[in-house]
Amino acid sequence: MNEIERQILAEVSLDAPWALVEDYARMPRWRPEDVNGGVDHLVAALGRHGVPVQVLEPEIYLSIPLHAAVMVGNQSYRAKPPSMSISVPNGIEAELLYLRTNPKTIRSYTRDPSEIFLDGGAELAGRVKGRIVIMEGFANPGTCSLLEEWGAVGVIAVNPGVDIHWGTCTTIWGSPDLDDLPRKPKIAVVAVNNPDGKQLIAAAAEGKKGRVVTEMQEGWFKQKLPVVDIRGKADPDRFVFVHGHLDSWDVGVGDNATGDATMLEMARVLWKNRDKLKRSVRIAWWPGHSTGRYAGSTWYADAYALDFDANCVAQIDCDSPGCRWATSYHQTTTMSETEAHVMRAIKDITGIDGKPKRPNQAGDYSFNNIGISSYFMLSSTMPEGLRAEKGYYAVSGCGGNIAWHTENDTIEIADKEILMTDIKIYLLSTLRNANDDVLPYDWRATAQEFGRTIEAYQKAAGAAFDLAPAKAALGSLSAALDKLYAGIASGKVKQKAANEALMRLARVLVPINFTREPRFRHDPAYTCPPLPTLATASELATMPARLVGFAKTQLMRGQNRFCAAMREAEGIVAQAMA
């Protein structure tokens, strides 16, 4: 840690961030007007510290849950509809069908029925048509879209505990465009708690009918979106982008008032020390994360896409830091090229060795299709031993606290000491990303990840498909990357050329590893495997014979895309070394 880093970290205080946490703990931020009020409160806090802020006002598409219930006979059960369920205030009635789900995938966004269900795969479709399906877990978009495709008229997700969790059931990322609209959910979806769910499962076993009622407020809403731009001195056009969602379910303290507070303190400290920044730092707080499936960050990615393409060196997602008992960093989200940078920051602040985790198709990772090196989504979390001791099931925020997405995500979920630690981790990693002479990325690590992925796919495919061209293209890029980093170390490759290459490589290598859709579009909100254009190779061995020819055709085209990407990346390296 250098002197500037030590000095800036020493200025971190909990005064401003904890005040915001306490205020937001009394301010629900899920209805559109309440989110705008939360933004006004944040803008006032920034103003008190002299931090200038621009407030944008996009119109984004939201679906706000108002009411839900499940009825069987004369018995009524409390329920919550996820965002983007259809609204059926008069209810929809059908026979109940229970499908056992795999407890290991209850928080997965997969659409693979063999991974989701315990009693079969695609052959279950015939049983689903015209039924209201009851399943354990959450109303995940992949599962709900699959059941809709199979003809279900409704879904009841039986949450694992005594509380009901809010969520969303759409696979559409952000506000829909015309191409997305066919995937807009067309069935009623609700969640119930576990005790009630067991009664509903018993009713399904008796062949009973159920009625699902949902009431939603849906449409286009003008939402405030605050952005702080702290200009660097040496290379002000290039920027590190830090962001997180301001809207939450209910008061949402651990998810995500603590994240909003973290970014407030980062803005305060970095603005005060702006003369020490080489590159710029931009910070944004999102509306539409919860009720718009990341609609705020998606709008911003669309509206400023060309600026991101030309100038963004990293995106850093700040979600659920500073929660009680979250003292472990064993599930830290990071792409391979930023892994060493992230792990070093965690080690320098905490003395703990973190463990990296591939980014999910979740959070506000709305920038993958542009191609931005990315890290963090969730940072600190509860140690696995403590989670097991408490009997907690897996959730996707609040540091592992099962208050996530419930009314119980209140002030007790935040922890001052852990919040201070997480603020410093976010601040140090951002500061280094802005100030390192050469961007702290190792694309050789990404190439090694690609190599492991291709080997796994080739092993699964066996003799059915040859990935040798992909291996060769990757090998050529890997050799070029070795020369690039040797040139950077020796000074043969100048810093400006090196940084341009390290940034431009993300525009090629991030999309090929995380997206199926073209650049400047958005992939669906369900699981995307590594190197998705080659991923069909892993399915060949179990694929019905009638589909193998089609799969090989897809793989041929996918391998072409991969090899072309490797060639393009190699060209970026060659230009830097010219």
Where do the protein language model's features map onto the residues?
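Metal-dependent peptidase/peptidase-like ectodomains
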Residues: V12, V189, G197, D235, ...
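Extracellular/luminal Protease-associated
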Residues: S83-P182, K186, D353
